[in-house]
Structure formats: C-alpha cells, structure tokens
Amino acid sequence: MPKLKTKSAVKKRFKLTASGKVIASQAGKKHFMRRRTKAQIRNLRGTTILCPQDGYNIKKYFLPYGIN
C-alpha cells in the first residue's frame, strides 16, 4: 500500500509543534486594514495555536500521519 499524501493546502498553512499542537497564522489581515487601529494590526502579526478541537480536525482529516 503506498504512502498517504498530505493535503498541499494544509501543508502550506499549518505546522505541528513538538507537543502535537497545530500552529496557524492569524486570520483577517488580507484587506480592509484601513479601518483597523494600529494596535489591531499589530496583534494580527505572527502565529497562533488553534483550539484543541480545530487542531484535532486538521490532524485527523488532512494530515495522514498527524495523529498517532
């Protein structure tokens, strides 16, 4: 049986930490930035850890070897 492939879209958008949590970049920073304050824009930088249920769904359905 051949190896399962990882979904390319998920591979580009998410990463797993050593403890198994899922990291994603902050959402909501593509457009409509002019109506946001500088503090809001600053808070959208970087990455965030997904909530446990969302992380579980990403690992279960899109990363074939993500859940042991």
Swiss-Prot record:
It comes from the Bacteria. Keywords: Ribonucleoprotein, Ribosomal protein. SUPFAM superfamilies: L35p-like. Signal peptide: none annotated. Belongs to the bacterial ribosomal protein bL35 family. This is Large ribosomal subunit protein bL35. InterPro entries: Ribosomal_bL35 (IPR001706), Ribosomal_bL35-like (IPR021137), Ribosomal_bL35_CS (IPR018265), Ribosomal_bL35_sf (IPR037229). GO terms for biological process: translation. GO terms for molecular function: structural constituent of ribosome. GO terms for cellular component: cytosolic large ribosomal subunit.
